[in-house]
Amino acid sequence: MAVTMAEITKLRKISGAGMMDCKNALTEANGDIDKAMEIIRKKGQAVAAKRSDREASEGCVLAKKDGEFAAIIALKCETDFVAKNADFVALTQAILDAAVANRCKTLEEVKALPMGNGTVQDAVTDRSGITGEKMELDGYNVVEGAYTSIYNHQGNNQLCTIVAMNKEAEAAAHGVAMQIAAMNPIAIDEAGVPESVKEAEIQVAIDKTKKEQVDKAVEVALKKAGINPAHVDSEEHMESNKAKGWITDEDIAKAKEIIATVSAEKAANLPQQMIENIAKGRLGKFLKEVCLLNQEDIMDGKKTVREVLKEADPELQIVAFKRFTLRAE
């Protein structure tokens, strides 16, 4: 049977599918809107399945708070064009609204929530079929506390933060949410940094310090032998500098011998206590950079976040925070 433009327009408004898809679905369903919707839905599922192995690196990140509960969610897609589409953003917001209203704690709970004629996951699959892009939910995080605050960085739906405080403090909480967005801390304080992270960082610091000590000894020995360390710091430089006439084969052989001998001797006689002390200092610097309370407050520029909060209210504390971004950092 022939379908009318009014019917096509109605189905398009309901489904969000393209004009031709709506026309074909209505024709196949003999004008039955409900059957046409099911046809579009099944087609969308098939399209989504074909795209399941693609990378979804764009998307929309949103945050919402409701009293003592706040959440972040990201709906990912393949292109910036779809990510900025009003319907895509609206779907992300609808999913977040449902998640917050139901106080969902996990992404699996969110996916299973009822939405439309199916679940949230069904709604995402349907939208994937309509746009022809892979879509997936990601980054669902929540915080709970006496007072919560959210921040959507620059309002571009790419980076959001949420923070929970032990008491109401609108300005301070908002400042903390902005701090988290800008400085990307991994914990509130040192106690929150996993021991595995500390151990890995101290090992990196030890290895770096040892290398610096060895390199310094080699540099001194090369200069003493009349060789410019910059001319022999790699095989590539040795060859290129020889071609320029800056060093000879004899210089290269001598440099290699000095580098090998001095490196081995210095590495075998490094003062362990000094190495550990330097490494601990570097760990302290790392913890200052990654612990929220230890960071320099981005708005004050001189005081730490801990000091700024104490000035605002001595009893004010950060209970929890989360941060999610789609951008590589």
From Swiss-Prot:
GO terms for cellular component: cytoplasm. Pfam families: EF_TS. InterPro entries: EF-Ts_dimer_sf, Transl_elong_EFTs/EF1B, Transl_elong_EFTs/EF1B_dimer, Transl_elong_Ts_CS, UBA-like_sf. Gene3D superfamilies: 1.10.286.20, DNA helicase RuvA subunit, C-terminal domain, Elongation factor Ts, dimerisation domain. It comes from the Bacteria. Keywords: Cytoplasm, Elongation factor, Protein biosynthesis. Belongs to the EF-Ts family. Associates with the EF-Tu.GDP complex and induces the exchange of GDP to GTP. It remains bound to the aminoacyl-tRNA.EF-Tu.GTP complex up to the GTP hydrolysis stage on the ribosome. This is Elongation factor Ts. It comes from Phocaeicola vulgatus (strain ATCC 8482 / DSM 1447 / JCM 5826 / CCUG 4940 / NBRC 14291 / NCTC 11154) (Bacteroides vulgatus). The gene is tsf.
